[in-house]
Amino acid sequence: MREYKLVVLGSGGVGKSALTVQFVQGIFVEKYDPTIEDSYRKQVEVDGQQCMLEILDTAGTEQFTAMRDLYMKNGQGFALVYSITAQSTFNDLQDLREQILRVKDTDDVPMILVGNKCDLEDERVVGKEQGQNLARQWNNCAFLESSAKSKINVNEIFYDLVRQINRKTPVPGKARKKSTCHLL
């Protein structure tokens, strides 16, 4: 079974842990308890293929920056999360993406931009178009708005990253073997 190392990044309080726990355990964590670093494993089926996801739920961008290079180096796919209710969390992601590209030393990194807390429409300050425009600037990066509370696009975030990783590095043994016939 293929393993996938996914990393959830973003500012403090955007809902990184809420999204991760909702995906892995199916529960919504109401209270804010700042994360240092949590790792979760979940087996899922994506496009008929069994996958073991290792999801690293990271500290907010303003804390524990020394650890960040290491999990950027080891991660295969990245969810960059902001809150639609806080402009600063959206603005913080540009530096984060640049850091990932620098550590990975490539522009082709499986990544998804996630506008979280879309259930709080009346508190929205970051428009959906802003997210779509930023995703376009980022080489047509995937983009979703989500809500851990309302279970909107939670699974899709992680499944999309798996699909991106599969496109970038196809599953070994999945391609049809070429058979040859030798006449002697």
UniProtKB/Swiss-Prot annotation:
Residue numbers carrying Cysteine methyl ester: C181
Where is the motif Effector region annotated in this sequence?
Answer: 32-40
Under Enzyme Commission nomenclature, its number is: 3.6.5.2
Q: List residues binding GTP.
A: 10-17, 57-61, 116-119
Query: Which PROSITE patterns does the UniProt record give?
Result: RAS
Say where the lipid (S-geranylgeranyl cysteine) is covalently attached: C181
How would you classify this enzyme at the top EC level? Answer: hydrolase
**Location(s) in or outside the cell:** Cell membrane; Cytoplasm, Cytosol; Cell junction
The principal location of this protein is membrane
What domain of life does the native source organism fall in? Eukaryota
Keywords associated with the record: Cell junction, Cell membrane, Cytoplasm, GTP-binding, Hydrolase, Lipoprotein, Membrane, Methylation, Nucleotide-binding, Prenylation
**Keyword Cell membrane in record:** yes
Reaction it catalyzes: GTP + H2O = GDP + phosphate + H(+)
Query: Got a GO cellular component term for this one?
Result: plasma membrane
This chain's function reads:
Probable GTP-binding protein that possesses GTPase activity. May play a role in endothelial cell polarity and endothelial barrier function.
Q: Which NCBIfam families match?
A: small_GTP
Q: What is this protein called?
A: Ras-related protein Rap-1b
* Naturally occurring in which organism (per UniProt): Xenopus laevis
User: What is the organism lineage in this UniProt record?
Assistant: Eukaryota, Metazoa, Chordata, Craniata, Vertebrata
